[in-house]
Amino acid sequence: SDLQTLEIKARHNEKVIIVTEGGKERYNSVYNGLEALKKHGKVPDYVLIHDGARACITTDLIEKCICEAEKYKACVAAVPVKDTIKISDENGYAVNTPDRKTLWQIQTPQSFEYELIMDAYEKMIKDSARGNITDDAMVVEKYTSVRVKLTQSSYKNIKITTPDDIIIAESFIKK
């Protein structure tokens, strides 16, 4: 509602441009946000899509992602994986071990030229066989020919989803 938007804007020093409803799935929420920008005539050159659960983001990472989006059209914050990763079969048996040197843990922000991500999302929304979409980079990878650049992030940019994550995030914030 307009009242909720005013309350959010008051609390966040007018940094909030538009407030829109989320969706059933993550991709629905992102698409709703992209659509709201267009509907309200606030179409930017670039958008950064970020998880609210990643509270330890830094200004430096945001600025880096903006620069990378300007240079590459599409980029995602990421860190090299530390652990060995296994591919399993449907019964829970390991069937393959990918080379760890080629694996990255994807984070947010995920940064794109607005028109690129909007076009990709519009194609995805029309595709009934879209499959399991877990991040915005997947949408660009699947529905455009643009390659997504992996932008070195920090292991401190964690997603807070469990009580243990809260303890870890608090330790980062206290430093």
Q: Each predicted region: which residue ranges?
A:
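A general structural signal for well-ordered alpha-helical segments in protein cores
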Residues: 3, 27-30, 49, 62, ...
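Acidic donor-binding segment of Leloir-type glycosyltransferases
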Residues: 1-18
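Conserved beta-strand scaffold positions in the cores of enzyme catalytic domains, especially
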Residues: 19, 74, 148-150
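Short, flexible, basic/aromatic active-site loop/helix in glycosyltransferases
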Residues: 87-112
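A generic structural signal for alpha->beta connector loops
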Residues: 13-16, 71, 91, 145-147
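Short, conserved catalytic or adaptor-binding loops enriched in Gly and charged residues
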Residues: 8-13, 96, 140-141
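Conserved alpha/beta core of the MobA/IspD/sugar-nucleotide pyrophosphorylase nucleotidyltransferase superfamily
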Residues: 104-175
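Conserved beta-loop-beta/alpha segment of the NTase-like Rossmann-fold superfamily
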Residues: 16, 25-88, 107
